[in-house]
């Protein structure tokens, strides 16, 4: 609303007149005299709109004309403002509210190497019967004062941090070698997150000295969060000490599939995630699940001869030991190759065993956030091939991570894709939906696997109470006594794990004691 001031003069008998022009001096007849009123042109909002439009257009001369008492360096101040922020564009618009106490808010949107938006304020005053901007450096930005300037400064960004589950940074030179292997794997899977970047910050400066960073210094790149548990990792690394053959250990949280530890010794090749090995008798967890689903009960009597011809090929137990007739649970605990080979031919077919293997993740791409291989179960070609597959030999291949997830499935009741990296878009990542196992199968295996530790092939190993597992001796190569990889997989509570020693021999003698050291360190 236009403002007015005036005085009342004594009554005179003269004709009122109107001065129409810039001054707008208006006579107003009132009782007892005439009020001579001076009206201010326009409104604060109109002046603000003209000023902000000129600022957007970089028309500093027009802006100066709308300012009450503009300083000598007015135009230069605005050019320095634009240059300091390295702007490629800027818009200034009045906000929705009208003037209040002579102040009008405006919205600034600056475009440059780092965009900036803020709300500024114009203070309007009456000067020479019109509305003018009362200008100070704070008119350009609320935090500007005499002697201060705004600058956009570009610098190298800090490398992205990789964090363990507890927030500890793990991508530094002091990190264990196995953890560094995982970091290198993440660089392959998430190259954009590790690329060298430059970061622009906007700050207040006094001369060349920074006073305050306004934006762009929010702690750098968002860190990469992992599921690694450093306590579990240290226990695994300690358990592997002194092993004179290549050895790997993987630990998972069974209920979620979270990878807690991946340890390889020596370093170089990440065999825990990328190695493909015959799983040997650890695969009997899968075969036993198929047999139980087909009607076999843990207490059912079965034959376990020392040697059995299946499809024209001789299968034998470790040391050709003959157990005669025993329960299915005992056959599992003592790892009877002849029992599982013959029963797979008599009661299963390749398609059915393959179906159950797939329910444990075989054939499923593994995308935990670092490169990892999938477990392989090719369709058996004949009875001999099926019997070999049933005991984890032949063409069946798996990594320690794959077999740890098999143990985790029994512990939790569902196979869950393992994962290491949280909150990132992993290329080709499969849905993390758990695949529930049959309840009867889970219940049976939860009696079979503890029996391995209490009464079977691992009964001489000092495991902590509550451990369930399966030994494996996976032959490879050729000859009458071919070399073998040593395996042990298992779980205790919500912790599932696997251990492999390349060329280590019997799982009960080599891999199982390593697993026991690992679990005892956590107990």
Q: What do these predicted ranges mean?
A:
Residues 39-46, 50, 55-103:
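Short solvent-exposed beta->alpha transition segments
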Residues 17-26, 30-55, 60, 415, ...:
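C-terminal region of N-terminal signal peptides and the immediate post-cleavage residues
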Residues 159, 274-283:
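Gly/Ser-rich catalytic serine loop of serine hydrolases
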Residues 18, 83-248, 256, 485:
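Extracytoplasmic/periplasmic proteins that interact with beta-lactams or build/remodel peptidoglycan
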Residues 1-17, 25-28:
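Terminal targeting segments of Actinobacterial cell-envelope proteins
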Residues 247-275, 290, 294-507:
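Beta-lactam-recognizing serine transpeptidase/beta-lactamase-like catalytic domain environment
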Residues 281, 285-288, 307:
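Acidic, glycine-rich loop-and-beta core segments that form the ion-binding/anion-interacting portion
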Residues 45-53, 61, 65, 168, ...:
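Solvent-exposed, polar/charged alpha-helical surfaces in well-ordered, non-transmembrane soluble domains
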């Amino acid at each position: 609303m236009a403002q007015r001031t005036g005085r009342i003069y004594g009554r005179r008998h003269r004709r009122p007149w109107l001065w129409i022009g810039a001054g707008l001096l208006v006579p107003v007849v009132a009782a007892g005299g005439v009020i001579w009123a001076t009206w201010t042109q326009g409104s604060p909002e109109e002046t603000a709109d003209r000023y902000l439009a000129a600022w957007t257009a970089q028309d500093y001369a027009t802006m100066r004309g709308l300012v009450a008492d503009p300083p000598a360096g007015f135009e230069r101040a605005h050019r320095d403002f634009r240059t300091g922020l390295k702007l490629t564009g800027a818009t200034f618009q009045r906000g929705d509210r009208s003037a209040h106490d002579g102040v009008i808010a405006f919205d600034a949107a600056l475009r440059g190497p780092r965009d900036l938006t803020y709300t500024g304020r114009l203070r309007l005053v009456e000067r020479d019967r019109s509305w003018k901007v009362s200008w100070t450096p704070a008119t350009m930005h609320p935090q500007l004062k005499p002697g201060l300037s705004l600058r956009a400064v570009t610098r190298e960004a800090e490398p992205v941090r990789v964090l363990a589950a507890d927030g500890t940074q793990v991508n530094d030179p002091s990190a264990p070698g196995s953890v560094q292997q995982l970091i290198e794997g993440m660089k392959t899977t998430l190259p954009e997150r590790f690329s060298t970047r430059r970061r622009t910050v906007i700050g207040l400066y006094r001369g060349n000295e920074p006073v305050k960073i306004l934006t762009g210094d929010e702690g750098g790149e968002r860190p990469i969060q992992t599921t690694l548990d450093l306590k579990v990792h240290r226990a695994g690394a300690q358990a592997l000490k002194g092993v004179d053959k290549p050895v790997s250990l993987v630990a998972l949280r069974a209920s979620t599939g979270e990878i807690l530890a991946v340890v390889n010794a020596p370093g170089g090749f990440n065999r825990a995630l990328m190695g493909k090995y015959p799983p040997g008798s650890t695969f009997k967890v899968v075969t036993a699940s198929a047999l139980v689903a087909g009607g076999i009960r843990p207490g059912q009597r079965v034959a376990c001869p020392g040697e059995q011809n299946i499809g024209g090929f001789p299968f034998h137990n470790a040391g050709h030991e003959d157990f005669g007739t025993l329960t299915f649970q005992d056959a599992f605990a003592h790892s009877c190759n002849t029992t599982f080979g013959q029963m797979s031919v008599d009661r299963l077919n390749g398609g059915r065993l393959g179906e159950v293997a797939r329910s444990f993740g075989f054939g499923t791409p593994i995308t935990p956030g670092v490169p990892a291989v999938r477990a392989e179960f090719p369709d058996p070609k004949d009875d001999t091939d099926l019997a070999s597959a049933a005991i984890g030999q032949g063409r069946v291949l798996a990594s320690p991570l794959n077999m740890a997830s098999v143990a985790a499935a029994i512990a939790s009741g569902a196979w869950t894709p393992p994962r290491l990296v949280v909150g990132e878009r992993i290329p080709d990542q499969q849905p993390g939906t758990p695949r529930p196992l049959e309840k009867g199968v889970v219940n049976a295996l939860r009696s079979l696997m503890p029996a391995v530790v209490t009464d079977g092939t691992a009964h001489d190993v000092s495991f902590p109470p509550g451990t369930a597992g399966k030994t494996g001796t996976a032959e490879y190569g050729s000859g009458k006594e071919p070399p073998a990889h040593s395996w042990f997989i298992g779980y205790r509570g919500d912790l599932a794990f696997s251990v492999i020693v390349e060329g280590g021999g019997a799982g009960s003698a080599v891999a199982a004691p390593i697993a026991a050291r690992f679990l005892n360190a956590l107990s």
